[in-house]
């Protein structure tokens, strides 16, 4: 894990990027923007102590949204390999549930 600091307006990742890390927002504001959003306001807002960027890592697929800092922000980044090592130690039922939930969210987004 590593601590990263971002400035307001800076992208943490963009839609289409390979998901290499999962993020935990420690401080600041991060907006999640779907590719179809041409507005200034995000589709979703990430709050402190919330995780984001997980779907691309869980599914090994390109990111479906962009994450942009709405203020200066500090995040903890967990690499794909660190995440997978933690998941492998988890109960097999929880591993399967995690993948199913992620796929369900992606399917719902694809239908919009």
Feature roles, as predicted:
Residues 1-112:
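Cytosolic regulatory regions built on CNB/CRP/Popeye-like sensor folds
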């Amino acid at each position: 894990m590593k601590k990263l600091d971002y400035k307001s307006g800076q992208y943490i990742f963009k839609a289409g990027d390979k998901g290499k890390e999962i993020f935990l927002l420690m401080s600041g504001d991060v907006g999640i923007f779907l590719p179809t959003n041409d507005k200034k306001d995000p589709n979703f807002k990430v709050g402190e102590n919330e995780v984001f960027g997980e779907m691309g890592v869980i599914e090994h697929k390109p990111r479906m949204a962009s994450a942009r800092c709405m203020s200066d922000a500090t995040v903890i980044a967990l690499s794909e390999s660190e995440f997978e090592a933690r998941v492998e130690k988890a109960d097999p039922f929880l591993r399967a549930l995690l993948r199913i939930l992620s796929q369900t969210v992606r399917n719902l987004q694809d239908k919009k």
